[in-house]
């Protein structure tokens, strides 16, 4: 049924025609409608299954209303604010007295009671004045109405609960069968940061099997949380008193960073990127010229020196690379010019938004900027896409990648940096943005947007993706105002998608900084910039690697590659010999010659996740061998020289899997 088309006659309710309980709405001319709606004319309606993306969104939105209904039943003084659908679930914010995790079960029980009653959910349209009267006791809803409703809007009623909403929703609460409340958090009200709201998170699925699978994955995700693994492996320190949001790496965490840095450096050199360095601080004039001052000022660290000079700690690396590029003139034969840098940037995030390595206030990007001609875009993109695939194959092995192409919204060119041609005098305005643009020659406002640069560049991106056999999704209107981009996501071991790489075209910076080259006819042409970060940032890729591998990183990335354990003090000398030989051959090794038992030594080192535990006793000492134990607990005996060769090969080839 959900994949078919249903003919509905004028005056019929969709709910009366479509009996499939897995259908939660209908789509007519690409617009979603409630099943309780009545057809205003004879229509062909597409049933929307609860198992579809649209259907799941509707289910979760309805579950958010069910949550608000339950909370206001149990806590009559609670004032609901908003309850949107988010990735993997929903939340609802309330102005209410504080509650704890122990209260979730009570709220969930009330939700189940309302669900079992199968209360009809009805859409009603009210004029603005009536809406203000209905929600007069809730200042949060009043603010939403005043800001967003001009004449009229809809509410959804289920029993005694009414909520301001555009919908659509499921026909009745009985459709919301598989749901779970997850946790409670605090949230700052966006219109008054002094006011803290109670945020309750939950999730909902079409059936119990999918819900159980998700909850199991959620538990696995908690076990794999990189913050937990970082503490267990002693990789970094997060000191909220001295450096809130700024990770401090131990020798073990820095080892992982250095390996990632070294690998990216080798890939950059292989692909023609020059390694550069730029300072962490610039005068604010460069940030004003680049546009970061206007756009990112609330998130920048700014300061003024006693002599009056104002400076900003860099939130991005691109202006520094532009400053290097601008030092000389270029011919068309000189391009492309590629600069790369492991550049640390600093962005102020609110304390509630900072978390681990995925949302720090300081992070290091594997940042690169290519300066090239328009006709070179396609080849450069192909090279970068190849680099992306090569890098992630090394880091993750055989992993699923997804590619998103964000392009311009052609119906709203005013939101982007485009060229305009004056219809009155023919003058061409390069790189303008906005609705009120005036021709500098004749002062006419009758301007024709010229999207040819965008179209040319976007087509080269499409061609690059297609020529490499890469499937991608295209998102109109999602491009940055200064150019289209490609985002790359990876799927980890438990099925989560993470965005890592970004390849971003930029028509804005070259205009702002006057970046040109001399073309084959001796004339000046505008340079095109490409911003690229393959890892995204070293912090983010490290976090994802730790969670993907549950801390059991490939040997080349593992801080402790071998851990040598003598079975008694009689073999300490041989154990030291093994340990020193491993180090001499470039293998990161540690040794435990304490008086603890072998089992206790192994138990103590287990959280650090060494690649191999080397146990030595009389047999190994007599034969100059080692017994190596891998992470799965499997043991194998090698001669010392053979084991060194095996591990060195595993490290040098950056293998994902262990030797045995």
Curated annotation (Swiss-Prot):
EC code: 6.1.1.3
Signal peptide: none
Keyword field: Aminoacyl-tRNA synthetase, ATP-binding, Cytoplasm, Ligase, Metal-binding, Nucleotide-binding, Protein biosynthesis, RNA-binding, tRNA-binding, Zinc
Key word Nuclease present: no
Catalytic activity: tRNA(Thr) + L-threonine + ATP = L-threonyl-tRNA(Thr) + AMP + diphosphate + H(+)
Domain of life of the source: Archaea
Purpose: Catalyzes the attachment of threonine to tRNA(Thr) in a two-step reaction: L-threonine is first activated by ATP to form Thr-AMP and then transferred to the acceptor end of tRNA(Thr).
UniProt protein name: Threonine--tRNA ligase
Lineage: Archaea, Methanobacteriati, Thermoplasmatota, Thermoplasmata, Thermoplasmatales
């Amino acid at each position: 049924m959900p994949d078919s088309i249903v003919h509905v006659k004028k005056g019929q309710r969709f709910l009366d025609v479509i009996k499939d309980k897995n259908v939660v709405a209908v789509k007519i001319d690409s617009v979603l409608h409630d099943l309780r709606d009545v057809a205003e004319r004879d229509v062909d309606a597409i049933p929307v299954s609860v198992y579809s993306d649209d259907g799941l969104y509707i289910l979760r939105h309805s579950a958010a209303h069910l949550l608000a209904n339950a909370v206001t039943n149990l806590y009559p003084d609670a004032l609901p604010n908003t309850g949107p659908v988010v990735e993997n679930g929903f939340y609802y914010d309330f102005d209410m007295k504080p509650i704890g995790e122990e209260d979730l079960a009570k709220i969930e029980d009330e939700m189940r009671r309302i669900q079992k009653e199968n209360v009809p959910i009805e859409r009603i349209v009210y004029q603005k004045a009536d809406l203000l009267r209905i929600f007069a006791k809730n200042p949060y809803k009043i603010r939403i109405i005043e800001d967003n409703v001009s004449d009229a809007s809809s509410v959804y009623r289920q029993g005694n609960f009414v909520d301001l909403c555009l919908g659509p929703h499921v026909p009745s609460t009985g459709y919301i069968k598989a749901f779970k409340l997850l946790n409670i958090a605090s949230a700052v009200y966006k219109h008054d940061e002094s006011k803290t709201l109670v945020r309750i998170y939950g999730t909902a699925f079409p059936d119990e099997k999918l819900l159980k699978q998700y909850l199991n994955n959620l538990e696995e995700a908690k076990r794999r949380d990189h913050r937990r693994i970082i503490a267990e492996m002693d990789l970094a320190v997060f000191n909220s008193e001295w450096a809130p949001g700024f990770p401090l790496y131990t020798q073990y965490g820095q080892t992982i960073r250095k390996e990632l840095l070294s690998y990216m450096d080798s890939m950059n050199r292989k692909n023609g990127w020059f390694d550069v360095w730029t300072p962490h601080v610039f005068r604010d004039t460069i940030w004003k010229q680049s546009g970061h001052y206007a756009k990112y000022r609330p998130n920048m660290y700014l300061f003024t020196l006693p002599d009056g000079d104002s400076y900003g700690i860099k939130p991005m690396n691109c202006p520094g690379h532009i400053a290097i590029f601008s030092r000389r003139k270029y011919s068309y034969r000189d391009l492309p010019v590629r600069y790369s840098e492991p550049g640390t940037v600093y962005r102020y995030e609110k304390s509630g938004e900072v978390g681990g390595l995925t949302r720090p206030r300081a992070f290091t990007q594997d940042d690169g900027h290519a300066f090239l001609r328009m006709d070179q875009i396609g080849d450069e993109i192909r090279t970068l896409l190849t680099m992306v695939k090569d890098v992630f194959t090394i880091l993750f092995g055989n992993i699923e990648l997804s590619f998103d192409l964000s392009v311009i919204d052609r119906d709203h060119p005013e939101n982007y940096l485009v060229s305009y041609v004056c219809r009155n005098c023919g003058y061409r305005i390069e790189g303008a943005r906005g609705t009120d643009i005036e021709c500098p020659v004749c002062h006419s406002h009758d301007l024709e947007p010229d999207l040819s640069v965008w179209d040319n560049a976007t087509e080269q991106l499409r061609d690059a993706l297609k020529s490499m056999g890469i499937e991608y999704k295209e998102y109109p209107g999602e491009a940055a105002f200064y150019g289209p981009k490609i985002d790359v996501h990876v799927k980890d071991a438990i099925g989560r998608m993470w965005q890592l790489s970004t390849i971003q075209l930029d028509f804005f910076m070259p205009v702002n900084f006057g970046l040109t080259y001399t073309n084959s006819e001796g004339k000046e042409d505008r340079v095109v910039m490409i911003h690229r970060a393959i890892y995204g940032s070293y912090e983010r890729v490290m976090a994802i690697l730790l969670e993907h591998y549950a801390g059991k990183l490939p040997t080349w990335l593992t801080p402790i590659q071998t851990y040598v354990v003598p079975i008694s003090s009689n073999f300490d000398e041989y154990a030291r010999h093994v340990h020193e030989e491993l180090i001499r051959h470039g293998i990161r090794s540690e040794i435990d010659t304490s008086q603890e038992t072998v089992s206790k030594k192994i138990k103590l080192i287990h959280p650090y996740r060494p690649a191999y535990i080397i146990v030595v006793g009389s047999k190994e000492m007599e034969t100059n061998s080692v017994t190596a134990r891998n992470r799965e607990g499997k043991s194998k005996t090698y001669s010392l020289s053979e084991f060194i060769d095996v591990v060195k090969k595993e490290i040098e080839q950056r293998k994902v899997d262990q030797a045995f």
